[in-house]
Amino acid sequence: MMDNILHIVPYTAQHGQFILSCQMNHKVLEADRHYINVDGDARNLVQDHLAFTGIVNDNPIFAAGMKMIWGQVAEGWVIATSEMWKHPLGVAKAIKKDFARVAKENNITRVQSAIRKDFSEGQRFAEWLGLEKEGLMRKWGFDGSDQYMYARLF
């Protein structure tokens, strides 16, 4: 796949390990780097039919999906390398395309995601996906950062 084209494939722990071992995709997220367990966190995101990876030239550049929390409630997540900025529209469209489909196909009624208060790009992306800001969670982040809870109901 050495064609500079974004290919979407099912997520694997190996994809996550590669992405998490690379530089984070935004300087604001570097604060979380010290709290990431590359192998364990990558494996923890594996859940059948709920996650996918974007690959360019045989390298994963982002992965996104949902992790069931309880009942029909899932946590939405995205991890990415800095390479994703070379394909921002393709990445955004791929995530938006599969976001609602994955939720509906798996009878998920709520998808939620915590986003750092100082990560405005992440907040705008969540809103573009149809998530609504529910409230501020003080000192909720790994590093004690304030984060907003965003959610979308289906």
Language model features with spans:
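Short amphipathic alpha-helix that is part of the acyltransferase structural core
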Residues: 1-36
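Active-site rim helix/loop that mediates acceptor-substrate recognition in acyltransferases
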Residues: 31-50
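Conserved beta-hairpin
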Residues: 48-64
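A conserved beta-turn-beta hairpin within the catalytic core of GNAT-like acetyltransferases
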Residues: 68-78, 146
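A short, internal acetyl-CoA/4′-phosphopantetheine-binding micro-motif in the GNAT/acyltransferase core
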Residues: 78-94
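Conserved acyl-CoA
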Residues: 94-110
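Conserved beta-strand-loop-alpha-helix junction that forms the acyl-donor binding cleft
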Residues: 108-127, 132, 140-141
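C-terminal "cap" of GNAT-fold acetyltransferases
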Residues: 139-154
